[in-house]
Amino acid sequence: MARYNLKAAARTLTRQKLRGRAANMWRYAEVLPARDPVSLGEGMTPLIAARHLGARLGLDGLFIKDEGLNPTGSFKARGMSAAVSRAKELGARMLAAPTAGNAGGALAAYAAKAGIPCVIVMPRDTPAANVMECEAFGADVRRLDGLISDCGQFVSENKEREGWFDVSTLKEPYRIEGKKTMAYELWEQMGGKLPDVIIYPTGGGVGLIGMCKAFEEMETMGWIGKKRPRMVVVQATGCAPIVEAFERGAKNADFWENAATIASGLRVPKALGDFLILAGVRETGGAALAVSDREMLEAGKELASQEGIFAAPEGAATVVAAAKLAERGWIKRKERLVLFNTGCGYKYAEAWARALGDW
């Protein structure tokens, strides 16, 4: 992973100096890898107090970090801004990555902004909105039979011959750097403190890994003490390798056969950084649980009608997880809890249309 001179960073990266900086993730430049960023204004997404939903769940300190308001409609913009910025500085001439949806749109947009061609490899059943988005940004879209793991194998097997700079999840160190800024923003938005609990929808898990890295950096710079938020992984019942590994006490997850879920970002049968995700959950006293597609869609409808947030199914899954953990008493009424909506619901129009038709 990327490392920084945090002693030097601490001298200039202060709350007072942050007040005068641009409201995007590059405000934390001292702990980011590029000096000449390729930016579309990503970051500084709102942290919204969910009072109506919190009242129903018996949670007084419930907040939603709405990453669906990033450029290209998901948190993937953060990682791709950092990765494409650094790839450009390193002289990359062609970028490539597999995707189940939102990462592809983000890569295509930032590659277009940087003036670098890109190849995006998708499962054939990727939602049409994601495919059209990538094509609109000028990407070379390849669609394959299989899952994202098969698409990743295609990139790996062809990148040397084709001269592709591989920006696949955890195949380069920079996407983590962009996504870790979610933790820095939480610290700022919560008045120099962190929440007691974070619930995060987890496929590849880079966002969770990045936030755990940010907490270490923040402690080294003197921003926080040793206490961490309890990190909670939520996955789909149709693809829950991290949950299964957590429950059996394993350090690594097994490949999840026949992965299937409406939440394309959670349909990752084997996360490359599974051991880092599991360590992050266990070291913070966190938890891992799976929810059904039906539960996600019902929670998404409630979130939209009660709080005005049209979430991706992945984001809606965090609402289900919060309800289950609150019911068990694992989350206390007065604790501060942040749910991450990682994407915009508009990209799932087909799924929503089917679900609303069923209702």
Q: What spans do the regions from the language model cover?
A:
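PLP-dependent amino-acid enzyme catalytic core
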Residues: 1-359
